[in-house]
């Protein structure tokens, strides 16, 4: 494939999708720029804070991005570039962006409450409770995983660590800590001040350049994994209850320019290397097979055997399984991800200053992720042979390795590969941290909503419910569970996260579809995405259950891990069916009164 054609062609399609389909959705749903938003009507200076759209886009995009749009396409590249590109474009425009935009808009019309409240008011309270439990446990898993990932990225003296890897981790930790400290100062300094957009952006970019330079050249922090896990627990505890304007908004706003810079650097690398001829034809096959393995192979397609063990070498950056449903589970954030609905209806909806900005922030933010997914596909294509041979420890390493090598192909930039690789790794790590504290705040919201009495507000809770809906109590429980799981072995249940995340997406689509139907608005654009994602999720869960039960009966692998995964897969399957039936009765049955 020609990298530049794929990149620019994909970008053009995404822009057309935003203008035409995104604009059509806004008209169909009745987006009203004159209508006050929850941030204006319920302004409390903590969670509900009207925010300028370009600042809110920084928070929203930083929170939903993480490593997802990078990891998914690179892992799924084993199926070929055509299936990946088609799903990113079709899934992004007609599934993911609709999902994100719909979740944000529904939350706006439900006082900035989460998807759980949308379910309670448009399906029933039992469905809400089930969704809350499921979403909360998923968020705890996200907190555990991201805390562990960030701690591993910051820590020194890890197993098999080299002096170079320790130094890279110290630099990443130093820059990230500087970001947090400066973000607080920036939030305090700009609070209540009307700073022109151009000046604000210029200041933000200047701050980023200085922070990266200082952190890169003065990596003064040197802590081990356990210490970082404890410190991260303290940090997210504070971040989840602090007013959004003092840390969440400024830190994510500053961090977003790191991501924008990463995208710009990637575009320069791909276009530049394509023009020079070094990357005009990337080596990924258009299509490989309907079944893929993650066994490493050489340039001739032969399995690579480790001479020390006599076993096949595995490609740690690749997915495996049947194209359906593996492709649609693996490529999550690059096409559609349930986590986005929690962000859109959790933090973003409480900060939106005008309904007209819902489309650029939610629909547009998703399509920017699609662009990042296409960039990731180009990156893996440039290092395809090494990728297939299992030469990379992670998809993030593939991404940074491919793009830094592309940049080095441009005349005059031959010596930039090393620093470009470090900066790209840093950018990805920074967004794992933003996703971590956003997930903690979302976990707090979901835990609080779980204990709200049916038909009442949080303020009306009494007794034990009043204690459990307290933001500090909810946050403490979430942090203890998340960090505790991260330190004791979240990897046992992590293989189910992909299916759980896409089940969240299916249920969010179902909730918004039910609300629009009850409100008398066109909801038919949700039918195909909703049903498709349910089928994908249920198929994946059935295949997981079958595989784990087979392993248990055969006595192969870790029986404890297989047993836990089998039970959880069965529980998720039942949950999906129950909520799907309840949702279908609402959508196709008697309509309920709904928020306008």
PLM region spans:
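A generic transmembrane alpha-helix motif of multi-pass inner-membrane proteins
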Residues: 1-17, 204-255, 268-275, 299-300, ...
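Transmembrane helix-loop junctions in multi-pass membrane proteins
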Residues: 2, 69-70, 82, 141-163, ...
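Extracellular loop-to-transmembrane helix junctions
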Residues: 2-19, 76-107, 116, 171-179, ...
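Selective recognition of specific alpha-helical transmembrane segments in multi-pass small-molecule
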Residues: 10-20, 135, 139-144, 206-211, ...
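Membrane-interface "cap" regions at the ends of multi-pass membrane proteins
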Residues: 13-70, 256
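Membrane-interface helix-loop-helix modules in multi-pass membrane proteins
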Residues: 49-110, 121-125, 142, 147-158, ...
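Loop-to-transmembrane helix boundary motifs in multi-pass membrane proteins
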Residues: 125-140, 364-371, 416-420, 449-487
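Extracellular/periplasmic helix-exit of transmembrane alpha-helices
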Residues: 271-313, 367-403, 438
